[in-house]
């Protein structure tokens, strides 16, 4: 038997990188021109039970609602209408409940999403960026998480990029031992 067939590869994605990558890939579905955020809910058996990204509510045309960040009238911005990735991941769950699960998310959740996360029974939030750390919304979210016993931590990736190469499936493995 050759060495190739006896040794697993070393550069595979470990679970945390995989789940955060799924959150980031999901974010690519967002039509928001300024913020693409994804979330991935995982149970204790490392099974994905929910995925979501930021977007307009089901049945509401994203061609008719505004995507701008600022306007004189708040109703002319995206903020009263858009559903955050965390909400969509919880609503899109493929399991009876998400109690005890972990959520991987690109951005630290706002206070409204923190309330949903707590009510859903999610026990851990792993986030990539906390760029709004000093905002009232994320300050309130951190307080809510602490009071409810939801742990949160910043994700430190092993790789700065994960490339999806659709052509790689067509290449043949090398027959030379390494």
UniProtKB/Swiss-Prot annotation:
Q: Which CDD domains match?
A: deoxycytidylate_deaminase (cd01286)
In which residues is Zn(2+) bound? 84, 110, 113
The record's EC number reads 3.5.4.12
Modified residue annotations for Phosphoserine: 174
Catalysed reactions, semicolon-separated = dCMP + H2O + H(+) = dUMP + NH4(+); 5-hydroxymethyl-dCMP + H2O + H(+) = 5-hydroxymethyl-dUMP + NH4(+)
SUPFAM superfamilies associated with the record = Cytidine deaminase-like
**Gene Ontology CC annotations of this record:** cytoplasm
Role description: Catalyzes the deamination of dCMP to dUMP, providing the nucleoside monophosphate substrate for the thymidylate synthase/TYMS. Also, part of a nucleotide salvage pathway that eliminates epigenetically modified 5-hydroxymethyl-dCMP (hmdCMP) in a two-step process entailing deamination to cytotoxic 5-hydroxymethyl-dUMP (hmdUMP), followed by its hydrolysis into 5-hydroxymethyluracil (hmU) and 2-deoxy-D-ribose 5-phosphate (deoxyribosephosphate). Catalyzes the first step in that pathway, the deamination of 5-hydroxymethyl-dCMP (hmdCMP).
Under the subunit heading, UniProt states:
Homohexamer.
The name of this protein is Deoxycytidylate deaminase
Tell me what gene encodes this: Dctd
């Amino acid at each position: 038997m050759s060495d190739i067939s006896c040794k697993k590869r070393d550069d595979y994605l470990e679970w945390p990188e995989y789940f955060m990558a799924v959150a980031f890939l999901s974010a690519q579905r967002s039509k928001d021109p300024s913020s693409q955020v994804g979330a991935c809910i995982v149970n204790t058996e490392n099974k994905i039970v929910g995925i979501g990204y930021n977007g307009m509510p089901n049945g509401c045309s994203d061609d008719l609602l505004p995507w701008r960040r600022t306007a004189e009238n708040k109703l002319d911005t995206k903020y009263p209408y858009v559903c955050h990735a965390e909400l969509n991941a919880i609503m899109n769950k493929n399991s009876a409940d998400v109690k005890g699960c972990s959520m991987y998310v690109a951005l630290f959740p706002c206070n409204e999403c923190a309330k949903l996360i707590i009510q859903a029974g999610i026990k851990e939030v792993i986030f990539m960026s906390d760029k709004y750390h000093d905002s009232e919304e994320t300050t309130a979210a951190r307080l809510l998480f602490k009071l409810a016993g939801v742990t949160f931590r910043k994700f430190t990736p092993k790789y700065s990029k994960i490339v999806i190469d659709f052509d790689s499936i067509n290449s043949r493995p090398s027959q030379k031992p390494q």
